[in-house]
């Protein structure tokens, strides 16, 4: 028996179809399709003969390369790296290679990468980032009455509504992580949306992780529902006085989580006062700063301080901020959970060894990445998907005796 590899001609002959039909069935085609029964016959024959398609031929036939582009703000952020791992595994199963762009919060680089992927005829592109919420004066993150944390030392909280956070990008589709820093002349959200639609209209696949943009496929995280579930669980443990580290003003993810948490507490009669909903950066340092503001304002740890002015529990809208808040408590000579309890959101796997263990809402981020990949490649019949979180109670929020 010959050791020569099986050729496409052999597959076509064995399946009883023309070489062109066999090529279209196996490699795909940008212009012509194959009847489903013929395609199945060819694919079954290829499997039986152990035929290995030529990736270059597939790319030429489809008019697409085997690259899948993934755009994130910061690959060093564990939120994005976990999503990227899920994308990479799903892409590997599809025989694709992931091309990663870490934009460092630059909307110019974000737009440039989408246009580069279109020029290079990548198979698909996935955007994972954050998105601006409408500036409607609502009570979400940065809504009316929200406080504002100062610098690393915590310059205090001020009431009142703020404008758009200067660090936010023109279009960042759901982060769970850091804010953007647009430069002068940053592209608008319309420009990025137009680039994504042009990529799709040229035959590429597109998926977003976060909030929907027009009719583009999206994997949404049920942020408000998860935060509401957490609020109810913490209230059930006996907590009544809460504060929220709400993230950047007008950041969609932060707003959804803040609104879900405070809304559930309002229904339970334990809504935090507006001055205890603090806007801050969506980072470890942002959490540290906002927590320091709460501690300094309460006077806890000082001769004239009143420990009763410190909230019983502080909810940070992501885990990284929660870790910063816990560090601020420690640096102030206080203890989590003895002096104040802390909870986060996301259940970042690299933070699960934090002591005390952090109560949070677990989001299956790798699954989110895999779902987005399936949407981008057209492997799902759905126009989108939604992922719901699970409350995980740990040592940072023990049951409170009242």
Segment roles from a protein language model:
Residues 14, 19-24, 61-74, 233, ...:
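Short beta-strand segments enriched in small/hydrophobic residues
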Residues 122-130, 205, 243-245, 277, ...:
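Periplasmic-binding protein-like
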Residues 2-3, 55, 67-232, 236:
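Alpha-helical recognition/docking segments in bacterial nutrient-uptake
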């Amino acid at each position: 028996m010959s050791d020569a590899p099986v050729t496409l001609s052999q597959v076509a002959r064995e399946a009883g179809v023309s070489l062109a039909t066999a090529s279209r069935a196996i490699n795909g085609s940008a212009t012509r399709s194959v009847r489903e029964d013929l395609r199945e016959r060819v694919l079954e024959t290829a499997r039986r003969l152990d035929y290995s398609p030529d990736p270059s031929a597939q790319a030429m036939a489809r008019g697409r390369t085997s690259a899948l582009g993934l755009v994130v703000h910061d690959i060093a952020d564990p939120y994005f790296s976990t999503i990227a791992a899920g994308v990479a595994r799903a892409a590997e199963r599809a025989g694709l290679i992931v091309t990663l762009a870490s934009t460092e919060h630059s909307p110019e680089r974000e737009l440039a990468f989408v246009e580069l992927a279109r020029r290079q005829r990548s198979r698909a592109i996935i955007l994972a980032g954050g998105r601006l919420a409408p500036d409607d004066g609502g009570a979400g993150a940065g809504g009316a009455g929200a406080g504002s944390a100062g610098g690393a030392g915590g310059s205090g909280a001020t009431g009142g509504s703020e404008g758009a956070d200067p660090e936010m990008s023109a279009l960042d589709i759901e982060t769970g992580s850091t804010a953007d820093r647009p430069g002068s002349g940053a592209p608008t959200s319309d420009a990025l949306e137009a680039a994504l639609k042009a990529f799709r209209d040229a035959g590429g696949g597109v998926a977003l992780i976060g909030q929907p943009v027009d009719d583009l496929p999206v994997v949404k995280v049920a942020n408000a529902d998860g935060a509401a579930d957490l609020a109810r669980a913490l209230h059930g443990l006996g907590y009544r006085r809460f504060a929220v580290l709400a993230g950047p003003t007008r950041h969609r993810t932060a707003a959804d989580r803040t609104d879900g948490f405070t809304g559930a507490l309002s229904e339970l009669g334990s809504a935090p006062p507006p001055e205890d909903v603090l806007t801050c950066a969506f980072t470890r340092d942002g959490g540290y700063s906002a927590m320091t503001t709460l501690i300094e304002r309460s006077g806890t740890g000082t001769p004239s301080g009143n420990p009763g002015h410190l909230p019983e529990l502080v909810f940070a809208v992501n885990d990284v901020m929660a870790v910063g808040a816990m560090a601020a408590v420690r640096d102030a000579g206080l203890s989590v959970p003895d002096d104040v309890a802390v909870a986060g959101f996301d259940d970042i796997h690299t933070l699960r060894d934090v002591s005390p263990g952090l109560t949070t809402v677990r989001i299956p981020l790798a699954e989110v990445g895999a779902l987005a990949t399936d949407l981008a490649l057209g492997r799902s019949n759905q126009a989108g998907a939604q992922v719901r979180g699970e409350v995980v109670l740990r040592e940072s929020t023990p049951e409170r005796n009242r």
